[in-house]
Amino acid sequence: MSETTTLEICGKTIHPGESTHFNLTSYRLPISDMLDTPVYVFRSLKPGPIVLLQGGMHGNETNGVEIVRQLVSRHGIKNPLKGTIIAIPILNIAGFIAGTRDLPDGRDLNRCFPGSKNGSLGSRIAYSLTREILSIIDLGIDFHTGGEKINNYPQLRCSFEDAKALELAKVFHPPFILNSPYREKSFRREAAKNTKPILVYEAGESLRFTKLAVEQGVHGTLRLLNHLGVCSIQVPKVDHTIILSSTSWIRARKAGLFRTTKKYGSFIEKDEIIGTISDPYGEKEYDLKAPADGFLIAINNKPVVNEGDALIHVGLEK
């Protein structure tokens, strides 16, 4: 929607030109304290798109939290030229406090959508986000990082079947754009059902700030907001974006100590040796070879690996 009048979110009325914050959800901890999920809304007097910036879907993915924090601290974000910016720095507050990916009951919040008013904790949070936020936005960016010990090179994920999402991803101008099918019960899937494009930004490693991941996330978001006319903030130019139609994981054939000889983000050639697995006693060593020409878009930084562990993520252009 491209609003011209008031917005109603969580029972709060927000007029054009207003900025405010409130809680999307509030729930009680076992120690009786309340845990709130803050939402920040910045509105222009001029009508325009409503854009969601969301971090902390998974509590240990701190790069996304830092990206949203840096964005909302900018004057140009707090005072948009047109439209509305809705920012949720941390969606999974309980997981963030505990430093864990999931909710206290072990559920993945990103598999709880569209949610239920009287369901599990994750289902209730998903229900509030779907009903109060997803229903009014035009598009959004959901900031993530790699899973435990997985370091993702900055990349945007969207379904190439969604022409609008792909167009927006190109405007964001990340190093890589990946064709990513929808996953049932995910936030992005629920948004697609309602024709709301959500770009998933993946960069860095859980529980670790990565300068490149944060910078690329901030700059890409500003490029997109500039393109939409929501802001006018100077952003560094980039050379090009590589579009990847598919990806493949290189997995450990043997257990042992894993080392890689390549930097993430680099191009690799088929059959090139890109890593080794050794036993801890210096007796045996196995080479890891690239399955095809492609780009190294993620590395597992875990030094001790088991058979079948995902080690290196390779992006393929065709």
Region spans (language model):
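Structured catalytic-domain cores with a bias toward divalent-metal coordination
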Residues: M1-K318
